[in-house]
Design a protein with these regions (language model features):
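Extreme N-terminal starter segment of soluble prokaryotic enzymes
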Residues: 1-4
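Conserved N-terminal subdomain of the carbohydrate kinase-like
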Residues: 11-23, 40-120, 134-139, 289-310
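Short beta-strand scaffold segments in enzyme catalytic cores
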Residues: 34, 80-83, 208-212
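Conserved post-catalytic alpha-helical subdomain immediately downstream of the catalytic base
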Residues: 43, 224-294, 298-299, 304
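Short beta->alpha connector loops
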Residues: 49-51, 123-128, 147-151
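Short catalytic helix/loop segments, enriched in acidic residues and glycine
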Residues: 19-34
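Conserved phosphate/ATP/ADP-binding segment of small-molecule kinases
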Residues: 137-141, 148-219, 227
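A short acidic, amphipathic alpha-helical/loop segment
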Residues: 56, 128-135, 156-160
């Protein structure tokens, strides 16, 4: 089955500790679509401007991404300018220019959502997320992401979007902004679940990800890397990978979520090893599976408890 990825393709300028990336293809949906397409046929809904390289859309199509839902504007593309701290832990957004995204129309996307088992609606204005959520087929498994800006400026709309979503992805700092209080983790997760999603995926950066909700708790550490050069898009790649894995398996249960989280974590590790989208452009599924097997072999399992007799 297919997955649906929406809505931002962009041109990025990113300052990193060891280099500066200028006018590179970016945007949350680029990372998410590349990740999703490793596991399932992927449909992309977005808009690009007159400066977006047509050859990149051709590349996405060759990777199994249906780009017919990508709209075109005569304005420049969505433009993100950012600078990372020396340790890559923090990023400062210097400029966000909507440009072509001001012309983005949601209703025309409806015909491209048919047959999509899952959908990842990446970080964007919650009012737009709501429109996309409402046009998706009712049985579609929906995943949304957000950021602290919308939690401050568009909280009522964001809460409505979270209530409609099956999976809500959020980082620790964002979660505290959302609930407007610093709480112990169990209380924080309880407050997030009251917003209505079936599952909360708690993004812990270099410490991995955790799942909470109606399917129980799952904790997946990060894959141990020798180096990371660019964290841009890692969370978007995670969301895209989860959508792709769920569509491939055609199931939404604890076991399929465990597979999706492990493979999503591995996809994120490939993402941060390259600049911009390089890591995702070059990786192939057998490499992902091999790294996942190595990763799982490093983790303790229930069998290890058999060594201790009660």
């Amino acid at each position: 089955m297919k997955s649906f990825i929406c809505p931002t393709l962009a041109i990025d300028d990113i300052t990193l500790p060891d280099t500066v990336l200028t006018k590179v293809v970016g945007g949350s949906s680029t990372y998410a679509a590349l990740a999703s397409s490793l596991f399932a046929p992927t449909v992309l809904g977005s808009i690009v401007g007159n400066d977006f390289p047509e050859k990149y859309l051709t590349f996405l199509a060759k990777r199994g991404v249906d780009t017919r839902g990508v709209q075109h504007s005569k304005k420049p593309s969505f433009h993100w300018v950012a600078k990372y701290s020396d340790d890559l832990h923090d990023v400062k957004t210097i400029k966000n220019e909507l440009n072509a995204f001001e012309d983005f129309r949601v209703p025309p996307l409806k015909k491209y959502t048919k047959g999509c088992y899952s959908a990842f609606i990446s970080n964007i204005d919650p009012d737009i997320q709501l429109k996309i959520l409402k046009l998706l087929p009712k049985k579609t498994i929906t995943i949304i992401d957000s950021m602290d800006l919308w939690m401050i400026e568009k909280l009522p709309a964001l809460k409505k979007a979270i209530k409609l979503a099956d999976i809500f992805m959020v980082s620790e700092p964002e979660a505290e902004v959302l609930v407007q209080e610093k709480l112990p983790l169990p209380s924080l997760i309880e407050r997030l679940m009251l917003l209505g999603p079936k599952v909360v995926i708690y993004k812990r950066g270099e410490h991995g990800i955790a799942m909470y909700g109606k399917m129980g708790t799952l904790i997946v550490p990060s894959y141990p890397l020798t180096f990371a050069v660019d964290p841009s898009g890692a969370g978007d790649a995670l969301g895209g990978a989860i959508a792709g894995v769920l569509s491939r398996l055609g199931r939404f249960d604890r076991q399929s979520m465990a597979s999706a989280m492990v493979l999503g974590s591995i996809i994120a590790s490939f993402t941060v090893e390259g600049y911009g989208t390089e890591g995702l452009e070059q990786v192939i599924l057998p490499e992902v599976i091999n790294r996942a097997k190595v990763f799982l072999s490093q983790l303790p399992c229930e069998d290890h408890l058999n060594l201790i007799k009660p």
